[in-house]
């Protein structure tokens, strides 16, 4: 029986073979960056947020946020599936959430790259109105209208909307993008985000940490050397990064955070409070009423936003439910102090990561010169106060919390395209990486906050006599035992010559690229047999599944275009109907009755067809609507042309008679 255990290489057979960490010094990094092959075509920057997303592009040397079709600078990261099968993304999806809560998917970024059994996922199951289900590979997926979707697929739909927004603005197809992720995302979550980009039809050139992108937006025009801290409290995640900005080099010194802490948690706290208050007053429990909870959730989010600028607000939800005594309403006054008391534990959870990030950067809080606030939750006065208390100074106000990340992504895109040449980004890996060794111990090869790209090797040996194969299990995390860390992947190295334990020399090499994606290689030094793995399916999606999702996204894209064309055709039909009816009413006494009746029949036929299409009784294509509209328009124009011609001839006849009489006068 083959043993699959590894142990550290024993000194009596060979000392540890520790290759030095490959870290690019500033000058070498500059050379590496400048010789990198430049990207052809426009590169957009996308902030794929938990609550809202944004897209930006560089226009010359100036980054610009692109407004969506509704004129907004951010788009809700919400996807819904209507009863007729239509897929809605963004504002349209959010608007119908109250009447369709089970099939409206929001905050799915919190599920990306996670297993169904994760504690965070189990908590979310109790808080969202839609179904979170377990996929066959153990990943957390979501369900809507009986169909199952991966969180990466939902993210792909949102990215597709951002792509469409950019293409409408630029008036040309867009393929290349830089997409941002929370700095504390692990490898699985990063790879799932890249999968989302692929599903959207994007070539994701780089995955950039959100705080780093915000620092790029902040420091692009700054001349002086600065040490900055980026405090990023968004809709679903919290990140803190400490950077040194020096002559165009943005070097991340440390990063920390919590991938399950954000505005959604603040909303949940407020929703629970409202439900408890209503139960106390009415005796009715709304916890299992999905439509009521969705209404309360929207009201809670609105109240939270209002209390950032007001000291008091009212939550009024009429007809929230009913019992034997009649309809029940929610009328609740909420003060800023009450809200702050409710969310104080959540704000406190950001303190420890900040202190750890400062410690890892070997800095005191007083040495940080600028504090940049990113994410919508940083607008809450209590959050700002907490940041001021931590750093002993007021945060900078020059960065838009909702837009900075997308702008930074666009800047990095311009760097990759060669349009911006004086900027270099040196990011870090947020979590330690290593393998399992004898006894379930987590042996680190790369420590957290190591500058990337990086490469490191270490030699191990067998843990049992005559062991001819080993299993390399790759983990990510900060705990001492592998059971407490995240398993990224595993592979077998076979064909090791039988020998006593501790004799074989197995070199394990970790290589992390600029996207923080991990590549692991193992080699038996005596035979040079090797095996490697790229942790490239952290989302749990196979290449076939991703390709299928790409095709689904393209299918939805085609359906969206068809629906848009059908809507435009229906609007044109309404316009032609109204114009024709108006003209018929105005000139009816001058028209041939039989011909006028034919036009009226065509009007009724088209109006009935349009009404059936709107009700869903028929699913008319744009071509069918166009054909029927053209028939009415052609018939009515022919009739009205005939009427105008006859009218013109009548007007000419008397004039000709008068002229003739005048000529016959003596």
From Swiss-Prot:
Gene3D superfamilies reported for this sequence: 1.20.1270.10, 3.30.420.40, Actin, Chain A, domain 4, Substrate Binding Domain Of DNAk, Chain A, domain 1
GO molecular function terms here? ATP binding; ATP hydrolysis activity; ATP-dependent protein folding chaperone; heat shock protein binding; protein folding chaperone; unfolded protein binding
The primary location reported for this protein is mitochondrion
> From the record, what ranges are coiled-coil?
566-637
Pfam families documented for this protein: HSP70
Sorted UniProt keywords: ATP-binding, Coiled coil, Hydrolase, Mitochondrion, Nucleotide-binding, Stress response, Transit peptide
Per the entry, what induces it? Up-regulated when grown with elevated levels of potassium chloride.
Q: Which reaction does it catalyse?
A: ATP + H2O = ADP + phosphate + H(+)
Transit peptide: which residues?
Answer: 1-33
Q: Write down the EC number.
A: 3.6.4.10
Give the family from UniProt: Belongs to the heat shock protein 70 family.
> What biological function has been recorded for the protein in this entry?
Required for the assembly of iron-sulfur (Fe/S) clusters in mitochondria. Assisted by the DnaJ-like co-chaperone jac1 and the nucleotide exchange factor mge1, it mediates ATP-dependent Fe-S cluster transfer from the scaffold proteins isu1/isu2 to grx5. Essential component of the PAM complex, a complex required for the translocation of transit peptide-containing proteins from the inner membrane into the mitochondrial matrix in an ATP-dependent manner. Constitutes the ATP-driven core of the motor and binds the precursor preprotein.
Assembly and oligomerization: Interacts with the Fe/S cluster assembly and transfer machinery. Component of the PAM complex.
Q: What is this protein called?
A: Iron-sulfur cluster biogenesis chaperone, mitochondrial
Species of the source: Emericella nidulans (strain FGSC A4 / ATCC 38163 / CBS 112.46 / NRRL 194 / M139) (Aspergillus nidulans)
């Amino acid at each position: 029986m083959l043993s699959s255990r590894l142990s550290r290489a024993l000194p009596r057979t060979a000392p540890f073979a520790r290759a030095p960490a490959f870290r690019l010094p500033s000058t070498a990094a500059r050379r590496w960056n400048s010789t990198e092959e430049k990207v052809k075509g426009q590169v957009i920057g996308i902030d794929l947020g938990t609550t809202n997303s944004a897209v930006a592009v560089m226009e010359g040397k100036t980054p610009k946020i692109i407004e969506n079709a509704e004129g907004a600078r951010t788009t809700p990261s919400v996807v819904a599936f209507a009863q007729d099968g239509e897929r809605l993304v963004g504002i349209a999806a959010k608007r119908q959430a109250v009447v369709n809560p089970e099939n409206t998917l929001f905050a799915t970024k919190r599920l990306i790259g996670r297993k169904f059994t994760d504690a965070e996922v189990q908590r979310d199951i109790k808080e969202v109105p839609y179904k979170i289900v377990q996929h066959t590979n153990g990943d957390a997926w979501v369900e809507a209208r009986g169909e199952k979707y991966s969180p990466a697929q939902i993210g792909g739909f949102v990215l597709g909307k951002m792509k469409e927004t950019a293409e409408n603005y630029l008036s040309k197809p867009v393929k290349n993008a830089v997409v941002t992720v929370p700095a504390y995302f692990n490898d699985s979550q990063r790879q799932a985000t890249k999968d989302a980009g692929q599903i959207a039809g994007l070539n994701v050139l780089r995955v950039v940490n959100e705080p780093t992108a915000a620092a790029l937006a902040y420091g692009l025009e700054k001349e002086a050397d600065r040490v900055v801290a980026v405090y990023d409290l968004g809709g679903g995640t919290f990140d803190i990064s400490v950077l040194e900005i020096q002559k165009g080099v943005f070097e991340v010194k440390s990063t920390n955070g919590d991938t399950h802490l954000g505005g959604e948690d603040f909303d949940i706290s407020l929703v629970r409070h409202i439900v408890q208050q209503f139960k106390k007053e009415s005796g009715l429990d709304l916890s299992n009423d999905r439509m009521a909870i969705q209404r309360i959730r929207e009201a809670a989010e609105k109240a939270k936003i209002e209390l950032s600028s007001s000291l008091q607000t009212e939550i009024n939800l009429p007809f929230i439910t009913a019992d034997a005594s009649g309809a029940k309403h929610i009328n609740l006054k909420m003060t800023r102090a009450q809200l702050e008391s409710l969310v104080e534990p959540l704000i406190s959870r950001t303190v420890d990561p900040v202190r750890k990030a400062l410690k890892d950067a070997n800095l005191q809080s007083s040495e940080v010169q600028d504090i940049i606030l990113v994410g919508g939750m940083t607008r809450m006065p209590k959050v700002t106060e907490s940041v001021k208390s931590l750093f002993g100074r007021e945060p900078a106000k020059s960065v838009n919390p909702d837009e900075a990340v997308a702008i930074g992504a666009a800047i990095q895109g311009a760097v990759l395209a060669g349009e911006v040449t004086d900027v270099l980004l040196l990011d870090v890996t947020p979590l330690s990486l290593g393998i399992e060794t004898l006894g379930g111990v987590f042996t680190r090869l790369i420590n957290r906050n190591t500058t990337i790209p990086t490469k490191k090797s270490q030699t191990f040996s067998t843990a049992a006599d005559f062991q001819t194969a080993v299993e390399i299990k790759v983990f990510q995390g900060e705990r001492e035992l592998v059971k407490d860390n995240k398993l990224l992947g595993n592979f077998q190295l076979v064909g090791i010559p039988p020998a006593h334990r501790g004799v074989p020399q197995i070199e394990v090499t970790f290589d992390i690229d600029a996207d923080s994606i991990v590549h692991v290689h193992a080699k038996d030094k005596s035979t040079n047999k090797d095996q490697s793995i790229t942790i490239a399916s952290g989302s749990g999606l196979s290449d076939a599944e991703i390709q299928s999702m790409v095709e689904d996204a393209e299918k939805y894209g085609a359906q969206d275009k068809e629906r848009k064309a059908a809507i435009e055709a229906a609007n044109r039909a309404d316009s032609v109907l109204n114009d024709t009816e108006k003209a018929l009413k105005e000139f009816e006494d001058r028209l041939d009755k039989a011909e006028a009746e034919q036009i009226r029949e065509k009007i009724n036929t088209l109006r009935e067809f349009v009404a059936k299409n709107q009700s869903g009784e028929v699913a008319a294509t744009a071509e069918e609507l166009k054909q029927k509209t053209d028939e009415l328009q052609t018939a009515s124009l022919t009739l009205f042309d005939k009427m105008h011609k006859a009218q013109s001839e009548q007007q000419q006849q008397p004039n000709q008679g008068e002229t003739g009489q005048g000529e016959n006068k003596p």
